[in-house]
Amino acid sequence: MAINTSRTQILFITIISFLILAQNVNSAAFTVSNFDPYKTNIELEGNAFISDGSIHLTNVIPNSAGRASWGGPVRLWDADTGNLAGFTSVFSFEVAPAGPGLIGDGITFFIAPFNSHIPKNSSGGFLGLFNAETALNTYQNRIVAVEFDSFGGNSGGNPWDPAYPHVGIDVNSIASVTTAPWKTGSILTGFNAIAFVNYEPVEKNLSVVVRYPGGNFVNGTSNSVSFIIDLRTVLPEWVRIGFSGATGQLVELHKILSWTFKSSFQ
Protein backbone atom coordinates (compact mmCIF):
# COMPACT_ATOMS: atom_id res chain seq x y z
CA MET A 1 0.00 0.00 0.00
CA ALA A 2 2.84 2.37 0.79
CA ILE A 3 4.34 1.73 -2.62
CA ASN A 4 1.01 2.48 -4.35
CA THR A 5 0.54 5.66 -2.32
CA SER A 6 4.04 6.78 -3.21
CA ARG A 7 3.42 6.13 -6.90
CA THR A 8 0.13 8.02 -6.70
CA GLN A 9 1.86 11.00 -5.11
CA ILE A 10 4.57 10.96 -7.76
CA LEU A 11 1.97 10.78 -10.53
CA PHE A 12 -0.01 13.63 -8.95
CA ILE A 13 3.08 15.82 -8.64
CA THR A 14 4.04 15.02 -12.23
CA ILE A 15 0.59 15.99 -13.54
CA ILE A 16 0.51 19.22 -11.52
CA SER A 17 4.01 20.12 -12.70
CA PHE A 18 2.98 19.49 -16.30
CA LEU A 19 -0.12 21.67 -15.95
CA ILE A 20 1.88 24.49 -14.38
CA LEU A 21 4.48 24.25 -17.14
CA ALA A 22 1.78 24.24 -19.82
CA GLN A 23 0.17 27.31 -18.26
CA ASN A 24 3.51 29.12 -18.14
CA VAL A 25 4.23 28.26 -21.78
CA ASN A 26 0.82 29.38 -22.99
CA SER A 27 0.42 32.57 -20.99
CA ALA A 28 2.39 35.58 -19.85
CA ALA A 29 1.68 38.00 -17.05
CA PHE A 30 3.71 40.67 -15.30
CA THR A 31 3.36 44.05 -13.65
CA VAL A 32 6.13 46.61 -13.26
CA SER A 33 5.26 49.71 -11.26
CA ASN A 34 8.85 50.80 -10.73
CA PHE A 35 11.58 50.07 -13.25
CA ASP A 36 14.87 49.02 -11.68
CA PRO A 37 17.84 48.66 -14.05
CA TYR A 38 19.25 45.84 -11.91
CA LYS A 39 16.06 43.88 -11.21
CA THR A 40 13.55 44.52 -13.98
CA ASN A 41 13.54 42.08 -16.91
CA ILE A 42 13.80 44.84 -19.51
CA GLU A 43 16.16 44.94 -22.49
CA LEU A 44 17.29 48.40 -23.58
CA GLU A 45 18.50 49.38 -27.04
CA GLY A 46 19.67 52.56 -28.69
CA ASN A 47 19.40 55.61 -26.44
CA ALA A 48 16.90 54.07 -23.99
CA PHE A 49 17.82 54.05 -20.31
CA ILE A 50 16.22 53.61 -16.89
CA SER A 51 16.31 56.41 -14.32
CA ASP A 52 14.21 57.34 -11.29
CA GLY A 53 12.00 54.27 -11.71
CA SER A 54 11.00 55.09 -15.30
CA ILE A 55 12.09 54.03 -18.77
CA HIS A 56 13.40 56.95 -20.82
CA LEU A 57 13.11 55.91 -24.45
CA THR A 58 15.21 58.77 -25.81
CA ASN A 59 17.73 61.36 -24.77
CA VAL A 60 16.59 64.97 -24.68
CA ILE A 61 18.51 65.77 -27.86
CA PRO A 62 17.63 65.83 -31.56
CA ASN A 63 17.67 62.60 -33.59
CA SER A 64 17.56 60.20 -30.65
CA ALA A 65 15.93 56.75 -30.79
CA GLY A 66 15.55 53.94 -28.30
CA ARG A 67 13.65 50.77 -27.52
CA ALA A 68 12.79 48.93 -24.31
CA SER A 69 11.28 45.45 -24.44
CA TRP A 70 10.40 42.57 -22.15
CA GLY A 71 13.39 40.28 -21.74
CA GLY A 72 11.67 37.03 -22.70
CA PRO A 73 9.61 35.81 -25.66
CA VAL A 74 5.81 35.91 -25.48
CA ARG A 75 3.70 33.28 -27.23
CA LEU A 76 1.22 34.99 -29.53
CA TRP A 77 -0.30 31.92 -31.13
CA ASP A 78 0.06 28.13 -31.13
CA ALA A 79 1.55 26.74 -34.33
CA ASP A 80 0.20 23.24 -33.56
CA THR A 81 -3.43 24.22 -33.00
CA GLY A 82 -3.58 27.62 -34.70
CA ASN A 83 -5.09 29.13 -31.55
CA LEU A 84 -4.53 32.84 -30.98
CA ALA A 85 -3.78 34.36 -27.61
CA GLY A 86 -5.66 37.33 -26.33
CA PHE A 87 -3.75 39.99 -24.47
CA THR A 88 -4.03 43.24 -22.60
CA SER A 89 -1.20 45.73 -22.21
CA VAL A 90 -1.76 48.66 -19.85
CA PHE A 91 0.94 51.25 -19.38
CA SER A 92 1.28 54.77 -18.09
CA PHE A 93 3.53 57.15 -19.96
CA GLU A 94 4.61 60.73 -20.25
CA VAL A 95 5.26 62.61 -23.46
CA ALA A 96 6.12 66.17 -22.56
CA PRO A 97 7.93 69.15 -24.07
CA ALA A 98 11.58 69.53 -23.16
CA GLY A 99 11.34 73.27 -23.77
CA PRO A 100 9.26 75.91 -25.55
CA GLY A 101 8.14 75.43 -29.13
CA LEU A 102 7.03 72.47 -31.24
CA ILE A 103 7.52 68.88 -30.08
CA GLY A 104 8.25 65.53 -31.73
CA ASP A 105 8.14 62.77 -32.59
CA GLY A 106 6.46 60.15 -30.37
CA ILE A 107 6.42 56.65 -28.92
CA THR A 108 5.03 53.20 -29.76
CA PHE A 109 3.99 49.95 -28.16
CA PHE A 110 5.18 47.27 -30.57
CA ILE A 111 5.02 43.53 -31.21
CA ALA A 112 7.74 42.03 -33.40
CA PRO A 113 9.69 38.78 -33.89
CA PHE A 114 11.75 38.02 -30.79
CA ASN A 115 15.01 38.39 -32.72
CA SER A 116 14.01 41.93 -33.71
CA HIS A 117 16.32 44.80 -32.80
CA ILE A 118 16.23 48.57 -33.20
CA PRO A 119 17.18 49.56 -36.76
CA LYS A 120 19.96 52.00 -37.50
CA ASN A 121 18.87 55.52 -38.48
CA SER A 122 15.39 55.06 -36.97
CA SER A 123 15.03 58.46 -35.29
CA GLY A 124 12.49 61.12 -36.16
CA GLY A 125 9.24 60.00 -37.77
CA PHE A 126 10.47 56.40 -37.97
CA LEU A 127 9.79 56.20 -34.19
CA GLY A 128 12.58 53.71 -33.46
CA LEU A 129 10.88 50.99 -35.53
CA PHE A 130 11.88 51.62 -39.14
CA ASN A 131 14.36 53.50 -41.29
CA ALA A 132 14.19 55.01 -44.76
CA GLU A 133 14.66 51.61 -46.42
CA THR A 134 12.00 49.72 -44.45
CA ALA A 135 9.44 52.35 -43.44
CA LEU A 136 6.96 51.73 -46.27
CA ASN A 137 8.12 48.28 -47.39
CA THR A 138 5.32 46.08 -46.07
CA TYR A 139 6.83 42.91 -47.55
CA GLN A 140 10.11 43.40 -45.68
CA ASN A 141 8.66 43.95 -42.20
CA ARG A 142 6.94 41.82 -39.59
CA ILE A 143 5.68 44.20 -36.94
CA VAL A 144 2.48 45.53 -35.41
CA ALA A 145 2.58 48.72 -33.37
CA VAL A 146 0.43 51.32 -31.71
CA GLU A 147 1.91 54.75 -32.25
CA PHE A 148 1.41 57.92 -30.27
CA ASP A 149 2.65 60.51 -32.76
CA SER A 150 2.90 63.99 -31.26
CA PHE A 151 3.93 65.76 -34.45
CA GLY A 152 2.06 64.23 -37.37
CA GLY A 153 2.24 65.57 -40.89
CA ASN A 154 2.43 69.23 -39.97
CA SER A 155 4.31 71.62 -42.21
CA GLY A 156 7.61 69.94 -42.92
CA GLY A 157 6.35 66.71 -41.32
CA ASN A 158 6.10 63.18 -42.59
CA PRO A 159 4.12 62.61 -45.80
CA TRP A 160 2.63 59.32 -44.51
CA ASP A 161 1.06 60.96 -41.45
CA PRO A 162 -2.24 62.81 -41.09
CA ALA A 163 -1.80 66.53 -40.58
CA TYR A 164 -2.29 66.38 -36.82
CA PRO A 165 -0.99 64.51 -33.77
CA HIS A 166 -2.60 61.08 -33.66
CA VAL A 167 -2.92 57.62 -32.20
CA GLY A 168 -2.47 55.02 -34.91
CA ILE A 169 -2.15 51.30 -35.54
CA ASP A 170 0.76 50.28 -37.77
CA VAL A 171 1.01 46.97 -39.63
CA ASN A 172 4.38 46.30 -41.30
CA SER A 173 4.69 50.00 -42.19
CA ILE A 174 5.09 53.40 -40.59
CA ALA A 175 1.96 54.47 -42.50
CA SER A 176 -0.85 53.67 -40.07
CA VAL A 177 -3.78 51.54 -41.23
CA THR A 178 -6.09 53.59 -39.00
CA THR A 179 -5.71 56.72 -36.88
CA ALA A 180 -7.59 58.96 -34.49
CA PRO A 181 -6.69 62.51 -33.45
CA TRP A 182 -4.60 62.70 -30.29
CA LYS A 183 -5.66 65.63 -28.11
CA THR A 184 -2.15 66.76 -27.31
CA GLY A 185 -3.08 69.72 -25.16
CA SER A 186 -2.38 67.26 -22.37
CA ILE A 187 1.19 66.88 -23.60
CA LEU A 188 1.83 70.59 -23.42
CA THR A 189 0.59 70.67 -19.83
CA GLY A 190 2.71 67.64 -18.85
CA PHE A 191 -0.01 65.24 -17.68
CA ASN A 192 0.62 61.50 -17.58
CA ALA A 193 -1.44 59.21 -19.80
CA ILE A 194 -2.70 55.66 -19.39
CA ALA A 195 -2.96 53.48 -22.50
CA PHE A 196 -5.00 50.29 -22.78
CA VAL A 197 -4.06 48.02 -25.69
CA ASN A 198 -6.29 44.96 -26.01
CA TYR A 199 -6.44 42.09 -28.50
CA GLU A 200 -9.58 39.96 -28.65
CA PRO A 201 -8.66 36.70 -30.46
CA VAL A 202 -12.17 35.59 -31.48
CA GLU A 203 -13.12 38.86 -33.16
CA LYS A 204 -9.44 39.51 -33.95
CA ASN A 205 -9.93 43.07 -32.81
CA LEU A 206 -6.92 45.16 -31.77
CA SER A 207 -8.13 48.18 -29.82
CA VAL A 208 -6.42 51.11 -28.14
CA VAL A 209 -7.70 53.62 -25.63
CA VAL A 210 -5.55 56.37 -24.15
CA ARG A 211 -6.81 58.43 -21.23
CA TYR A 212 -5.61 61.36 -19.15
CA PRO A 213 -7.19 60.78 -15.74
CA GLY A 214 -5.93 63.93 -14.01
CA GLY A 215 -5.73 67.66 -14.51
CA ASN A 216 -8.39 70.27 -15.19
CA PHE A 217 -7.67 70.60 -18.90
CA VAL A 218 -7.82 66.91 -19.75
CA ASN A 219 -9.95 65.40 -17.01
CA GLY A 220 -11.81 62.49 -18.60
CA THR A 221 -10.27 63.06 -22.03
CA SER A 222 -9.76 59.86 -24.04
CA ASN A 223 -8.83 58.80 -27.55
CA SER A 224 -9.54 55.40 -29.08
CA VAL A 225 -8.89 53.46 -32.27
CA SER A 226 -9.31 49.84 -33.34
CA PHE A 227 -8.52 47.52 -36.25
CA ILE A 228 -9.50 43.98 -37.21
CA ILE A 229 -6.38 41.90 -37.84
CA ASP A 230 -5.40 38.24 -37.64
CA LEU A 231 -2.00 38.54 -35.99
CA ARG A 232 -1.03 35.07 -37.23
CA THR A 233 -0.77 36.48 -40.76
CA VAL A 234 1.79 39.08 -39.69
CA LEU A 235 3.77 37.80 -36.72
CA PRO A 236 5.52 34.56 -35.72
CA GLU A 237 4.43 32.31 -32.88
CA TRP A 238 6.89 33.82 -30.38
CA VAL A 239 7.29 37.58 -30.25
CA ARG A 240 9.00 40.49 -28.54
CA ILE A 241 6.82 43.13 -26.89
CA GLY A 242 7.96 46.57 -25.86
CA PHE A 243 8.18 50.28 -26.48
CA SER A 244 10.08 52.55 -28.83
CA GLY A 245 10.49 56.29 -29.12
CA ALA A 246 12.26 58.88 -31.21
CA THR A 247 13.02 62.55 -31.55
CA GLY A 248 13.89 64.29 -34.81
CA GLN A 249 14.81 67.93 -35.22
CA LEU A 250 12.25 68.58 -32.49
CA VAL A 251 12.68 67.23 -28.97
CA GLU A 252 10.39 65.97 -26.20
CA LEU A 253 10.49 63.64 -23.19
CA HIS A 254 9.45 60.00 -23.72
CA LYS A 255 8.93 58.08 -20.46
CA ILE A 256 7.25 54.78 -19.60
CA LEU A 257 6.17 54.96 -15.96
CA SER A 258 4.53 51.56 -15.39
CA TRP A 259 3.51 48.48 -17.36
CA THR A 260 1.12 45.59 -16.88
CA PHE A 261 0.83 42.82 -19.48
CA LYS A 262 -1.27 39.66 -19.53
CA SER A 263 -1.88 37.14 -22.29
CA SER A 264 -3.77 33.84 -22.33
CA PHE A 265 -5.25 31.23 -24.62
CA GLN A 266 -8.94 30.38 -24.37
UniProtKB/Swiss-Prot annotation:
Protein induction: Accumulates in roots during colonization by arbuscular mycorrhizal (AM) fungi (e.g. Glomus intraradices).
Signal peptide stretch: 1-27
UniProt-listed InterPro entries: ConA-like_dom_sf (IPR013320), L-lectin (IPR016363), Lectin_LegA_CS (IPR000985), Lectin_legB_Mn/Ca_BS (IPR019825), Legume_lectin_dom (IPR001220), Leguminous_Lectin (IPR050258)
Transmembrane spans: none
GO biological process, one term: response to symbiotic fungus
Glycosylation sites (chain numbering): 121, 205, 219
Annotated disulfide bonds: none
CDD domains referenced in this protein's UniProt entry, alphabetically: lectin_legume_LecRK_Arcelin_ConA
Glycoprotein is among the record's keywords: yes
Gene Ontology MF: a single term: carbohydrate binding
UniProt keyword annotations, A-Z: Glycoprotein, Lectin, Signal
Pfam families to which the protein is assigned, alphabetical: Lectin_legB (PF00139)
Biological role stated in the UniProt entry: May be involved in arbuscular mycorrhizal (AM) symbiosis with AM fungi.
Family: Belongs to the leguminous lectin family.
Protein name from the UniProt record: Lectin 7
Organism in which the protein naturally occurs: Medicago truncatula (Barrel medic)
Taxon lineage: Eukaryota, Viridiplantae, Streptophyta, Embryophyta, Tracheophyta
